[in-house]
């Protein structure tokens, strides 16, 4: 999600910041993020910056922390994360927190718009792999720990003689 969101935002000439761990920052800069922040060293919610759109793939921040990072018309979009935090964000919206907006995304909506971008190479998937399928248990942990960059891809051996 993050790598596609970056590419789509850059097509619209947006300035895009990325927040992740130190091991990924160099790759994120190479992908085109204008600024990268290591959340272990710096709290982006305390920088005083305001954003028009935040796409969050982890949902580890409180509604209060998130609200202070958005412009008055800013939007916060989450695509996964801790269910307890998601519920708290819904309650924050209903309780009148000024900058919180809830945006529901429908699966596979707008795929027809993305297909030409993918087929022409204007939108490129970022692949972490391929990894052998025998590494599946390790890869599940690797993915769960958030150490991957892009989509984790495994090779599956072909059946011969069938």
Regions found by a protein language model. Give the residues of each.
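Terminal helix/beta-alpha structural elements that buttress the NAD(P)+-binding lobe
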Residues: 1-162
């Amino acid at each position: 999600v993050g790598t596609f969101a970056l590419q789509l935002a850059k097509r619209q000439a947006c300035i895009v910041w990325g927040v992740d761990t130190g091991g990924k920052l160099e790759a994120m800069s190479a992908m085109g993020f204008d600024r990268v922040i290591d959340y272990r060293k710096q709290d982006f919610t305390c920088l005083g910056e305001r954003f028009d759109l935040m796409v969050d793939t982890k949902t580890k921040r409180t509604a209060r922390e998130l609200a202070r990072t958005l412009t008055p018309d800013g939007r916060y979009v989450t695509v996964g994360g801790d269910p307890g935090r998601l519920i708290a964000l819904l309650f924050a919206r209903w309780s009148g927190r000024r900058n919180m907006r809830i945006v529901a995304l429908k699966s596979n909506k707008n795929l027809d718009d993305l297909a030409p971008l993918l087929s022409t190479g204007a939108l490129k998937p970022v692949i972490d792999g391929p990894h052998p399928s025998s590494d599946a248990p390790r890869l599940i942990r690797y993915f769960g720990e958030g150490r991957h960059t892009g989509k984790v891809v495994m090779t599956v051996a072909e059946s011969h003689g069938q």
